[in-house]
Structure formats: structure tokens, C-alpha cells
Amino acid sequence: PASEKVVKHVDRCLSCLSCMTTCPSGVNYMHLVDHARTHIENTYTRPFFDRKVRDLLAAVMPYPRRFRALMWLAAIGKLFAPVLPQRLRAMLALAPSTPMSRPLDAGRIVWPAAGTRKKRVLLMPGCVQQVLAARINDATVRLLTRLGHEVVVADGSGCCGALTHHLGKEDLAHQAVRNNVRAWTGEIDGADGIDAIVVNASGCGTTVKDYGFMLRGDADLADAAAKI
């Protein structure tokens, strides 16, 4: 089982991956930390409050509508912050006080290119990002369509899986990955094909690039994940 000392150090890792860019031996610390997080989740018993917070994050943050609702509740909760425990006050302080953006509608979305279509790209709208910073996706769509790119959000795509992956909840993360691989493969193999996948959140991009490794043992989707 993981010790408290190990858990403390792994929990403090931000997965910035600076260690990988500076390591002269090329050690893949990303996969080592990912393995450690899963091992901790499966073998270490966290305090009750910590377990419930992590379960709440896994159940809410990957789903934009749930996350938006939680942010509204947090904004209301700030009114009662003075009488709440310190840890809850600290968490509420992180929540935005301004109105949150409404997530994109579910299902397939297509923004046609302005003029002659030159390229066709998939857009990963993200989960947390499209609630807290939807203008980034809006600007991306405007720019790409103006440059002659058709932009598509695939039906069935969603969270990249990074949130649950970093919580050590491997099964939930891999399910999110499978959902995206299936959704994107349908567009990639379609009549019009796909020229690129556009990801605005760097953490999501890092995870998507690792889909081949994450699903390396999946008999049905390993090849499709590696292609992505």
C-alpha cells in the first residue's frame, strides 16, 4: 500500500512535466506519476472529507452542466463563507463570482467554413473550460471558419479524461477516453474525413496525445487510439 509520505509528494505533483523536459535520461515521469496515482487510489485510505471531495470532483467536473450548477451553488455559498470551516472557505474562494458561460448543446455541432472549405477539423470543447472560459472556443471557431475551416464537435465526445485520470480513477478516465475515440473515429472515417483535432486546453492536449498509451491494452480501440 502507498504510504502517507508517498501520497503527500504525489498529490503535490502538478503534472507540468517540466521534469521530463529537463531529465537527461528521458525518463517518462508522466506515466510513473499516473501509475502512482492509480496505485494510491486503490491502496490508500484517505480521510473521509478528502474522499468525498474527490468523488464529488469526479462526478461533477467532467460534465459541463453539472459543473456550471456547482459553480452557481458555490457563488451562493460564498455568502455563508464566514461561518464555514476553513477548508470549505478556501475552496469557495476559488469559485468565480461572475456568471458562468452556458455549455454547448449536446450532440453533433458543425460550423461551416466561410467561403470555400479548405480543411475540416474536430474541436474538443472541453468540460471545465467551456464553463469558465467559453470565449476561447468561440474565438477559435470564428478564426478557423474565417480561414476556410469547417469545425465539428463530434456527437458523443466529452471530457478528455484528464480530470479523473489525475485523481487516480483509471476506470472512469478510460471510459471517457473510449467515448472520445469512438466519437472521433466516426468523423475521421467518414466521407469528409478530418484534417486535425483542435484542443484549446493544454492539459487536455497532453492527455489526448497519450490516448494510444492509455488504451494500449484495449483489443477493440488500441489502433484507433494510437491513430488519434
Functional labels for PLM-detected ranges:
Residues 1:
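N-terminal cofactor/phosphate-binding cores enriched in small/glycine residues
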Residues 7, 12-39, 207:
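Iron-sulfur cluster-binding cysteine motifs and their immediate structural context
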Residues 29-228:
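Iron-sulfur cluster-binding electron-transfer modules in prokaryotic oxidoreductases
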